[in-house]
Amino acid sequence: MGRTLVLIRHGQSEWNIKNLFTGWKDPGLTEKGHAEAITAGKNLKAAGLKFDIAYTSALQRAQKTAQHILEQMGQSDLPLIKNSALNERDYGDLSGLNKDEVRQQWGEQQVQIWRRSYAVAPPNGESLRDTGARVWPYYLYHIQPHILRSQTVLIAAHGNSLRALIMALEGLNSEEIISQELTTGIPLIYTFNSDSTISSKTIITP
């Protein structure tokens, strides 16, 4: 299968279940998170995929997700390229704080703006636009060339870094991206035409 990109949000992390803003903090996966990544690898193998190259962020929850997938596919020796350009959005002063407590302090409306608006960043953090400003150039210069050479590429990363990438890939506007949600451990498969436009999009559910 040529010109293929698989995106996957890391499996459930320890801070996901604690309801904490994570950002660039580095908690590991929960038992469920490990299982989600293993299942994703099995499903990708069953779909007949084989990766030529794999990318992930500088954070262990994404790295371990990628490792589980490659192990299940019999490709544990494939180089895994790690780069902070694919890191989760930096939540700044909110990082490590409980989401419910932040809502109580700042108000539901303000927190929703920080979490889901395109251009508004939390204090000392990144907006989705800021996140896209590092994700998209990295994709264009380092990842897309492999896809255009008819290779199959894995990116294991994070909810907001992947949302920023999807926004650019699909040409979504700042309103459309607000409703885009990525479930932990669920692969999203794109195939591309030779001119880099999207040919197909498939979600592999457990």
Swiss-Prot record:
Keywords: Gluconeogenesis, Glycolysis, Isomerase
Pathway: Carbohydrate degradation; glycolysis; pyruvate from D-glyceraldehyde 3-phosphate: step 3/5
Gene this protein is translated from: gpmA
Biological process per Gene Ontology, one example term: gluconeogenesis
Sequence positions that bind substrate: 9-16, 22-23, 61, 88-91, 99, 115-116, 159-160
Classification via InterPro entries: His_Pase_superF_clade-1, His_PPase_superfam, PG/BPGM_mutase_AS, Phosphogly_mut1
Gene3D superfamilies reported for this sequence: Phosphoglycerate mutase-like (3.40.50.1240)
Site positions (Transition state stabilizer): H158
Source species of the chain: Bartonella quintana (strain Toulouse) (Rochalimaea quintana)
Molecular function GO terms recorded: phosphoglycerate mutase activity
Function, as annotated: Catalyzes the interconversion of 2-phosphoglycerate and 3-phosphoglycerate.
Name of the protein in its database record: 2,3-bisphosphoglycerate-dependent phosphoglycerate mutase
Classification via SMART domains: PGAM
Active site residues per record: H10, E88
Subunit and interaction comment: Homodimer.
The keyword Iron-sulfur appears for this protein: no
HAMAP family: PGAM_GpmA
Main EC class the enzyme belongs to: isomerase
Catalysed reactions, as listed in the record: (2R)-2-phosphoglycerate = (2R)-3-phosphoglycerate
SUPFAM superfamilies in UniProt: Phosphoglycerate mutase-like
Family membership noted in the UniProt record: Belongs to the phosphoglycerate mutase family. BPG-dependent PGAM subfamily.
EC number: 5.4.2.11
